[in-house]
A protein has these predicted regions:
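Rossmann-fold NAD(P)H-dependent dehydrogenase/reductase core
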Residues: 2-185
Length: 185
């Protein structure tokens, strides 16, 4: 698999993909390549203004790309629910779910639901999103879920006694914990 490149992506015409965090980094590049190979890509983004710019940039490189910009804030589980509901109203299939959105090594903050931000955004929201979309995923032949992780998972530890980092907080330990929760394959 180490020699696998974008050129190895099969024809994705007729396929639907969701990429969280699609406006920058790995999410942006993945969105571009999935679209280049014919998929309809739902760009799930927290900041719609940045999402619109990313969408325009992709359309410059991949004219005719089938993109659908939708709001998703992984720091708020009500936004995750709203996204899943809106997606299921528009689409009856989901071939690729790429759980990519994330935050890295930030000062301690909490999500709208009171979870430590890195664990909430990097793992819990994606876990919830996958569960909310499981019906459409299982009804789509050959559907795949890919959760982007990090090599930080290899050094991460789950602190079950202080999962939310309320007693002691290290931004890198919290990041490693969030990535270990969704380990690399």
């Amino acid at each position: 698999m180490s020699n696998w490149t974008q050129a190895d992506i099969p024809d994705l015409n007729g396929k639907v993909a969701v990429v969280t965090g699609a406006n920058s980094g790995l999410g942006f590049e993945s969105t571009k390549e999935l679209a280049r190979h014919g998929a309809t890509v739902v760009m799930a983004v927290r900041n719609m203004e940045k999402g619109e710019k990313a969408e325009a940039d992709i359309l410059k490189e991949v004219p005719g790309a089938k993109l659908d910009l939708m709001n998703l804030d992984n720091a708020d589980l009500s936004s995750v629910q709203a996204f899943a509901d809106a997606f299921k109203q528009k689409y009856d299939r989901l071939d690729i779910l790429m759980n990519n959105a994330g935050v890295m090594a930030i000062p301690r903050q909490e999500t709208a639901d009171g979870f430590e931000m890195q664990l909430g955004v990097n793992h819990l929201a994606h876990f919830a999103l996958t569960g909310l979309l499981l019906g459409v995923l299982t009804n789509t032949p050959g559907a795949r879920v890919h959760s982007v992780s990090s090599s930080a998972a290899f050094n991460g530890q789950i602190n079950f006694d202080d999962l939310m980092g309320e007693e002691e907080y290290s931004r890198w330990a919290a990041y490693g914990q969030s990535k270990l929760a969704s380990p690399p394959s």
